[in-house]
Amino acid sequence: MQLTELIETTVVGLGYELVDLERTGRGMLCIYIDQPAGIAIEDCEKVTRQLQHVLTVENIDYERLEVSSPGLDRPLKKLADFERFAGSEVVITLKKPLDGRKSYRGILHAPQGETIGLEFEGKEGAAMLDFTLADMDKARLVPKVDFRSRKQ
């Protein structure tokens, strides 16, 4: 079983989604998890403990294991991510430029089959970009932070 498959099986088995996995040159393994209710430190601890056991049993070599939430600017990689975050503001970077432009920021529309829509502000007003996962280099949520809503 490959490392990604092993980790995803473990994470999903605990009730979380594997958002991303990074393995650095110095033996560090970074795992990013999520769930609809968000991630708390206890969730990270639970996944860390389970993965430590699984990686030891499977004899996977690593120096350090880090489990965390994907953050406010969560990457979107799977079609299910685009469905879940439809209506959210995102930044999309395409692999190849379209009309001389690779990066777009706008409101995500729910996928229609394999096609994903992004409503953005073009040169002549509101415009729509239709793309597929194959067209996309990367996509991230735009963080929304409201400091004024704090209670006094």
From Swiss-Prot:
Q: Which cysteines are joined by disulfide bonds?
A: none
Q: Which UniProt keywords apply?
A: Cytoplasm, Ribosome biogenesis
- Keyword Acetylation: yes or no? no
Q: Name one GO cellular component term.
A: cytosol
Subcellular localization(s) per the UniProt record: Cytoplasm
User: Carries keyword Transport?
Assistant: no
Q: Which InterPro entries match?
A: Ribosome_maturation_RimP, RimP_C, RimP_C_sf, RimP_N, RimP_N_sf
**UniProt GO BP:** ribosomal small subunit assembly; translation
Q: Which family does it belong to?
A: Belongs to the RimP family.
- NCBIfam families on file: PRK00092.2-1
* Its biological purpose: Required for maturation of 30S ribosomal subunits.
What PANTHER family has UniProt attached to this entry?
Answer: RIBOSOME MATURATION FACTOR RIMP
> By what name is this protein known?
Ribosome maturation factor RimP
Species of origin: Paraburkholderia xenovorans (strain LB400)
